[in-house]
């Protein structure tokens, strides 16, 4: 059977992983699915992608979290995105 490969932006996993930490700093922030996705999308657009090659059907162990500098960048991008979404959520308050 042919191997089916695909690309995965590993940065996406990192951003989702840090999202809850950033939200924990801001009790007033909306935590609905729409806002969470908006925050992650905005943050990802500020961050460089980190693509890895994956093979369909293969279970991969989680890559080690990015180095401290990258974490700081992700944290900053998420914090900015959170403020943007808070100012203009795409739904009624
Ligand atoms: Zn919301």
Which residues does each predicted region cover?
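Charged, amphipathic alpha-helical regulatory modules used
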Residues: 2-93
